[in-house]
Amino acid sequence: MIELFMKQKMFSFKDAFHIYDRDEQETFKVEGRFFSLGDSLQMTDSSGKTLVSIEQKLMSLLPRYEISIGGKTVCEVTKKVTFSKPKFVISGLNWEIDGDLWRDEFQLTDGENVRMSVSKKWLSWGDSYHLQIAYEEDVLICTAIAIVLDMVLYNDEDESIF
């Protein structure tokens, strides 16, 4: 089980997240671009090498984001139309989101196995979240999906769930 802590940078003109390991060492940094049409973020390692790209697809009625690792599209995350709690489709992976997104407690599953659990850390400066990722090979994609969910649900309200 890989444990990461995700903190959204406060007071920034662009989207920015810092991801730390259990020893409080920064593992990844995620930053958006200034003046881009739609959201466009890059996840980098400690040396500044881009590992993941997150691009909002603007030619869509509903929020839709493409996640690429190493230049290859891995999945798309699209918000579905609902009248109650938010729902998302994660195409390309056949994964599902279970739990309560509004209460900041949910799991990402592949139908049988939990791939990631997310919970909000209360009483912290800014928005901080605890990510528990079951498989090492899922660290990048799970972290990117958590960031996309935050952007879709709370970007317009200047709030965050991750």
From Swiss-Prot:
UniProt cross-references to Pfam families, sorted A to Z: LOR
Signal peptide region: none
Lineage: Bacteria, Bacillati, Bacillota, Bacilli, Bacillales
Gene that encodes it: yxjI
Family under the similarity heading: Belongs to the LOR family.
SUPFAM superfamilies: Tubby C-terminal domain-like
Protein name as catalogued: Uncharacterized protein YxjI
UniProt-listed InterPro entries: LOR, LOR_sf, Tubby-like_C
